[in-house]
Amino acid sequence: MSFDPNLLHNNGHNGYPNGTSAALRETGVIEKLLTSYGFIQCSERQARLFFHCSQYNGNLQDLKVGDDVEFEVSSDRRTGKPIAVKLVKIKQEILPEERMNGQVVCAVPHNLESKSPAAPGQSPTGSVCYERNGEVFYLTYTPEDVEGNVQLETGDKINFVIDNNKHTGAVSARNIMLLKKKQARCQGVVCAMKEAFGFIERGDVVKEIFFHYSEFKGDLETLQPGDDVEFTIKDRNGKEVATDVRLLPQGTVIFEDISIEHFEGTVTKVIPKVPSKNQNDPLPGRIKVDFVIPKELPFGDKDTKSKVTLLEGDHVRFNISTDRRDKLERATNIEVLSNTFQFTNEAREMGVIAAMRDGFGFIKCVDRDVRMFFHFSEILDGNQLHIADEVEFTVVPDMLSAQRNHAIRIKKLPKGTVSFHSHSDHRFLGTVEKEATFSNPKTTSPNKGKEKEAEDGIIAYDDCGVKLTIAFQAKDVEGSTSPQIGDKVEFSISDKQRPGQQVATCVRLLGRNSNSKRLLGYVATLKDNFGFIETANHDKEIFFHYSEFSGDVDSLELGDMVEYSLSKGKGNKVSAEKVNKTHSVNGITEEADPTIYSGKVIRPLRSVDPTQTEYQGMIEIVEEGDMKGEVYPFGIVGMANKGDCLQKGESVKFQLCVLGQNAQTMAYNITPLRRATVECVKDQFGFINYEVGDSKKLFFHVKEVQDGIELQAGDEVEFSVILNQRTGKCSACNVWRVCEGPKAVAAPRPDRLVNRLKNITLDDASAPRLMVLRQPRGPDNSMGFGAERKIRQAGVID
């Protein structure tokens, strides 16, 4: 657009305030400003006027959008449109003194002009906010409104004056002063988490800071100790707390610098296993390093590479960690050197891995008779141990139980290093003078208390005419039977690794003492490959294996009298050996009392209820009389039917008799009084309504029914109950029918069927009828049917 200043309707009159013109002047605001022209928004009327920059009286560089100006109105000769001429910038009014405090909401972008230069008179803007009467207001500002050479950032605290443009009504912030820069975000690592709050170890100072879970900006379920976070510190109730907590990528926060070089030193102070109450030092351990100037470095329980116990005097290798926050040095990545045992005063022992469990195991010791417990964490050099591996270790008392020992600092040894015995091939004969016993059965848990020590046995033997004795251990006996006093044995002599100590090994039983006492008993229980014998006093039961029975095991029956000897096997358990079936020579000492009593079983035999500790059963007299309430014991001999299984609470009839070597009055000839009804009968078996144990029904086979009677449901029967020793299940035998049950009466036809039949109308001619036109034909003993199958049309009869 071209403009000629001489084309104005002012006849060359200058029209400035100092001139003589009486033309009316108006005021307005620069709305748009370009290189050579611009536009003015009139203040007194709704008009927008063009002006040429040549009409401005002053430095054009000082003129910008929003400035108040005074001007005259003229008209363009070419277009006739009104234009503004003779522009004068109006001086700004004095700003009010009241200043507001606020905060930068959106800062003016940095380097905006270099990226996209603005046109003359146009400046980038930002926004600030302030609060008044609980309400927040937002204002714009430009870089020219900031006092001093200050670059504002979002979040900065500021002080400013509110400016209201009377021409446009726009409100903005002017004379902005920076009060406080926004606090930088801090970083740290979550070190502890409680129910509703946690603590962060700060990355700038050696200090922890509290934070509430409501301040965590993210999924709280994913937050866990060790996570890197950033946060803002605020003051609440006089204490610093972390707010606006956010997760950082793992590895962002680094507290310390670890040296690449490895150092060697000596442990001068170990970390106590049980810290004292007044111990506040987080790094209680000490390692001495021989630098030019000797120095002691602290270390904590997390600075060791493994959980192997450290001892004073240990030679170790480590790195030095320097804390970035306070420059504190400490030893870390500590590992025990292989030659450390040359400098410590510990007594090392050897053994073989005997058992491995989940996280712990047991070592068979060369110099100890008990197996030594150890934790996997005590294995040196990160080796993985297996059963039969040879190891070296140190024995220390358990911190939780001083009566127990356990192995620490376990080092794997080459195969063939550990030797339990060095014995000759020469065999000796001797006689047992003292029996050897085992320790308590081994447990898989280290927290069962102190185990009982095993006791050595003594063997007397003759060597070149000299009578000598030698010790032997129960674990060195061959076979399952332990030798007893007076038994003849064969053995070898071995030198253990303990200096100057000889023991008998490979001990084999040659013969029992001929003077050993033979005992009588009665077969009480028969299992698959073992059984139990009731003693002659009828108060205990003795285990025996079928391999100890002389004769055909199938010929043994419950109640048979047997003769046996006692022996102690592994685990100090007493068992019967050399069991022989004998005749009843020392049975009942007196005739049974002919009086028959009625009673109730208040405790069954142990073979019926294995959970009870007592072997004998007990019967209480229930019939009226002087003896009512008296209780008498019974055993397998007292049963009329030795295979009968008496349950607690069953009614019985019995006699009294003096039995056993101690002449004890016991129940004898016990017969149960059982009556019940038949529940149902299948093909070859049935069930009786009788409760035994957890079962409400009692099984019986039809071959157990006496006299070949066919039982029906509802029949009342008497029977005996036998216990299958192999399966542990009970069944009925010797089933007698006492009386027949009620005959089954045909049930009447249900009413619904009767009503349905009544509603059928046979005379209804319209009802559908089914008529048989041809009976089906079967095969005629030929190679198929004579009539060929053809495709027929439905509903059409040939």
Curated annotation (Swiss-Prot):
The modification Phosphoserine is found at residues 123, 276, 514, 584. There is a cross-link at residue 91 (Glycyl lysine isopeptide (Lys-Gly) (interchain with G-Cter in SUMO2)). Keywords: Acetylation, Cytoplasm, Isopeptide bond, Phosphoprotein, Repeat, RNA-binding, Ubl conjugation. InterPro entries: CSD (IPR011129), CSD_CS (IPR019844), CSDE1 (IPR056400), CSP_DNA-bd (IPR002059), NA-bd_OB-fold (IPR012340), SUZ-C (IPR024642). The modification N6-acetyllysine is found at residue 81. It holds the Pfam family SUZ-C. Residues 26-87, 136-179, 186-245, 297-337, 349-410, 447-507, 519-579, 610-670, 674-735 form the CSD domain. Residues 748-789 form the SUZ-C domain. This is Cold shock domain-containing protein E1. The gene is CSDE1.
